[in-house]
Amino acid sequence: MSRKKAIFLYLLGTLGQIWLISIIVFVLRHLGMVVDYRTPMGILAIGIGGVSSALWGTIIAVRYKKYSTKKILKDFFTIKQNRGSYLFVIVFLFLDFCYVAFDGELAFNTWYIPIILFLKAILFGGIEEVGWRYVFQPIMMERHSYISSTLFTFVPWGI
């Protein structure tokens, strides 16, 4: 697979999956269904849309870079920092959700919604880096400088 084709397939797959999920949610809402963070359908949509960059990053890493899925999972889940740093992340995520739960505008109708949102942030919040920083940016760096590649990564990631 060529470099251009890898970039094209990654962007098409990632953004296409997000757009497809967005259109499905729009249509379901237009038909009168409630699809938001409080419903299983909404959480499923957030999960499928949120995992798009990791999924397509893994596909491209396997096909273009010839990485094994085992290597990708090992690289992603290997603890690289002091365990205390991970504890800080969990504490700050908890503080972030406490603010929203007790003082923000989200209204939690059931006790388990903050727990689900917290787990969703941990499971799906950083997984997008597999696609953008692990696959897309290194492919861009084959032809461009680090700064240019970072800017090229920032634009579609921001979309």
Model-identified regions with their sequence ranges:
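Interfacial transmembrane-helix boundary/kink motif in multi-pass membrane proteins
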Residues: S2-L12, T39-I46, Y64-F97, M141-S149
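Alpha-helical transmembrane segments in multi-pass membrane proteins
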Residues: L11-V62, W111-I116
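Residue-level signature of the transmembrane alpha-helical core
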Residues: L15, V51, I90, F118, ...
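Divalent metal-coordination and catalytic microenvironments
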Residues: I18, I72, E129
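Juxtamembrane "helix-exit" motif on the non-cytosolic side of transmembrane helices
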Residues: I23-V34, C98-A107, I159
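Hydrophobic cores of alpha-helical transmembrane segments in multi-pass inner/ER membrane proteins
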Residues: G49-A61, V91-F92, L123-V130
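Hydrophobic alpha-helical segments and helix pairs
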Residues: K80-G126
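Membrane-interface helix/loop boundary segments of multi-pass membrane proteins
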Residues: I127-V155
